[in-house]
Amino acid sequence: VIPFVASVAAEMMQHVYCAASRRC
């Protein structure tokens, strides 16, 4: 498992959630 990929995926998911909920 590559930690970098996991980190990028986690950040992307959080960004999507932030944009969707509009609570940035």
From Swiss-Prot:
Subcellular location: Secreted
Domain of life: Eukaryota
Family label: Belongs to the frog skin active peptide (FSAP) family. Brevinin subfamily.
InterPro entries attached to this UniProt entry: Antimicrobial_frog_1
Organism this protein belongs to: Pelophylax ridibundus (Marsh frog)
Protein name: Brevinin-1Ra
One of the GO BP terms on file: defense response to bacterium
Disulphide bond pairs: C18-C24
Function as written in the Swiss-Prot or TrEMBL entry: Antimicrobial peptide.
Tissue distribution: Expressed by the skin glands.
